[in-house]
């Protein structure tokens, strides 16, 4: 479960892993909802500077809030936005190199409008000594949403490169430290917060550190791609894990902090608990 922007945006994800010989299949179901979005399009009384309808004075009917005009609060309405997604990923070895293929379907509703989209991701990973490197090509060759109006909202391909390396500058018994870095490159997501911008190309990085004690307690900290600090804690038991992540708000703090809670359960552990209860 994830809560963002002080609870305005909420999302839930449920994931499963199905063992199929040596090629596991990962299934993920996603829901995201945004409620109480204000719609102010019908509030403007666009009657011009004199505030009287039908006089054709300057400003009447121009769609702009001019001096002398006002808003009708009774015309304020609210709508919501919902997304339901499905993602399936499988892993295969091609000439000894692990190759991942991900297929995704997204259903999107915005007020009275509806859209449907599909996409394909490709990825592979490689271990070089103690360093794990992964590369993901998203939306290959391209993907997008088809709206009920016939409009196609396209999404071009992007690339993500990640690396993980364990290290121990100071040896502490039963303690392991992991470092991680992620680079995201795109040609359509260029924005003012991009760390590197060259024409339409953008490149953003994220960094993280994770310390694990006795494979039970995890402490995490880092910086995301928009230079916001992140942190988190994780506790692991046999067949059961709880993780919490925290993301700071923007500089002004107007959008609130983000909170992410993850719960991981082992199916084998659940079945063993059920078996014990039945025996009792």
What is the meaning of each model-derived region?
Residues 1-280:
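Subset of outer-membrane beta-barrel
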């Amino acid at each position: 479960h994830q809560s963002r922007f002080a609870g305005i945006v909420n999302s839930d994800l449920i994931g499963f892993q199905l063992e199929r010989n040596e090629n596991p299949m990962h299934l993920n179901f996603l829901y995201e909802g945004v409620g109480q979005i204000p719609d102010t399009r019908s509030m403007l009384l666009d009657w011009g500077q004199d505030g009287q309808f039908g006089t054709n004075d300057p400003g009447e009917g121009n769609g702009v809030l001019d001096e002398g005009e006002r808003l009708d609060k009774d015309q304020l309405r609210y709508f919501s936005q919902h997304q339901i997604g499905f993602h399936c990923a499988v892993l295969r070895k091609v000439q000894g190199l692990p190759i991942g293929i991900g297929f995704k379907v997204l259903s999107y509703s915005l007020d009275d409008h509806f859209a449907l989209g599909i996409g394909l991701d490709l990825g592979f990973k490689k271990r070089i000594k103690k360093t794990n490197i992964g590369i993901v090509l998203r939306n290959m060759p391209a993907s997008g949403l088809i709206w009920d109006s016939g409009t196609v909202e396209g999404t071009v391909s992007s690339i993500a490169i990640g690396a993980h390396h364990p290290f121990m500058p100071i040896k502490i018994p039963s303690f392991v430290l992991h470092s991680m870095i992620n680079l995201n490159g795109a040609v359509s997501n260029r924005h003012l917060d991009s760390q590197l911008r060259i024409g339409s190309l953008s490149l953003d990085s994220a960094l993280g550190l994770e310390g694990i004690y006795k494979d039970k307690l995890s402490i995490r900290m880092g910086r995301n791609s928009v230079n916001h600090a992140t942190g988190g804690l994780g506790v692991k038991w046999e067949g059961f894990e709880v993780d919490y992540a925290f993301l700071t708000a923007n500089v002004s703090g107007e959008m609130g902090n983000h909170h992410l809670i993850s719960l991981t359960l082992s199916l084998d552990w659940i079945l063993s608990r059920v078996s014990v209860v039945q025996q009792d």
